[in-house]
Amino acid sequence: MADSDPGERSYDNMLKMLSDLNKDLEKLLEEMEKISVQATWMAYDMVVMRTNPTLAESMRRLEDAFLNCKEEMEKNWQELLTETKRKQ
């Protein structure tokens, strides 16, 4: 059985390269769409916060409460681990 000629291999390589390029471009387009959606939501959030200043303050208080709660939970978790190690 004879090997395929160099022109045919070159053509097959070109088709594979074009197919790979097409897949890469599709992935890039999908990523750009995701970034575009994120930017749109960021712009929307900025408009909402500027038109409703109390929302920004509420978000800050909520974040502070969350961080305080998280800190307390971590402290309690460390205490529990310390007690468990002492008992063993």
Swiss-Prot record:
InterPro entries: Synaptonemal_3. Homodimer. Can form higher-order homooligomers. Interacts with SYCP1 (via tetrameric core); the interaction remodels SYCP1 homotetramers to 2:1 heterotrimers with SYCE3. SYCP1/SYCE3 heterotrimers form lattice assemblies as part of the mature synaptonemal complex via both lateral and head-to-head interactions. Interacts with the SYCE1-SIX6OS1 complex; the interaction recruits the SYCE1-SIX6OS1 complex to the central element of the synaptonemal complex. One of its GO terms (biological process) is reciprocal meiotic recombination. GO terms for cellular component: central element; chromosome; nucleoplasm; nucleus. Disruption phenotype: Mutant mice are characterized by infertility in both sexes as well as complete disruption of synapsis initiation resulting in meiotic arrest. Initiation of meiotic recombination appears normal, but its progression is severely impaired resulting in complete absence of Mlh1 foci. The keyword Cell cycle applies. This is Synaptonemal complex central element protein 3. Keywords: Cell cycle, Cell division, Chromosome, Coiled coil, Meiosis, Nucleus. Major component of the transverse central element of synaptonemal complexes (SCS), formed between homologous chromosomes during meiotic prophase. Required for the assembly of the central element of the synaptonemal complex during meiosis, via remodeling of SYCP1 lattice structures and promoting recruitment of SYCE2-TEX12 and SYCE1-SIX60S1 complexes. Required for chromosome loading of the central element-specific SCS proteins, and for initiating synapsis between homologous chromosomes. Chromosome loading appears to require SYCP1. Required for fertility and normal testis development. The gene is Syce3. Induction: Up-regulated in cryptorchid testes. It is found in: Nucleus; Chromosome. Residues 8-75 form a coiled coil. Expression is restricted to spermatocytes and is absent in spermatogonia, spermatids and spermatogonia (at protein level). Expressed in adult testis and embryonic ovary. Expressed in the convoluted seminiferous tubules in spermatogonia and spermatocytes.
